Amino acid sequence: SLIEILGWNSEERFYAFSNGIYANGRFYPTDDLGVVTVGRKSYYLPAFSAIHKDNEHGYSFERTYRCDPQGATTLRDFFAQIVKVYGTGGMVCIAWALAAIFRDIIFGRFKYFPMLNLFGRKGSGKTELARAISSMFFVLPSTPCSCANTSIPVIGYNLSHARNSIFILDEFTNDLMPQRIDIFKGLWGGTARSKMEDGIPITIPVTSGV
């Protein structure tokens, strides 16, 4: 079956990346066609499939959301370095990131999930801290998704295509266009945006911590 939403799959009880599935305490990588078999079931993850090898611009979000099972850094050492560099602020980020892994449970109970607002002087390391925390899930591009320049449909897509994960919206300012400010109003309550599709109102959910 096709895996359209990455991250936590509550029905199948596994965590999906674009290059494989983590289940039963181990990582199952995709084959050359993007197929991965877990137990008796097979799943299709198209981002790195040979079928799409010539599609350089497609699956741009999914291709950053991949797992490196050979990583040598332990979670303990990773968190220790964040706290060493960022102190108490780093501790808050770690706590929030761990909560994001269980976002569906928290949101299901309280009907909201807190946003993490990293603020400070220019050059103080806000974006790098966000990138560090997000590296638990992503191999990030050099430039994170911009509040001002990334199109609203793309922001909505990215916010709803990984469950129980983290998503960075970079460079928030108070002079953003009203349509973009409206996105932030909905994030707390779990809605990225609404649209009409074939005359039917569709709500795009937020499935990750922001």
Put a short name on every predicted segment:
Residues S1-Y86:
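Extended, charged/polar low-complexity intrinsically disordered regions
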Residues F27-P29, I94, M196:
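Generic alpha-helix signal with a bias toward terminal, lower-confidence helices
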Residues Y59, G71, L75, A95, ...:
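Residue-level signal for well-ordered alpha-helical segments
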Residues G87-A97:
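N-terminal pre-P-loop "Q-motif" helix
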Residues M91, A100-V210:
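Conserved NTP-binding/hydrolysis core of motor NTPases
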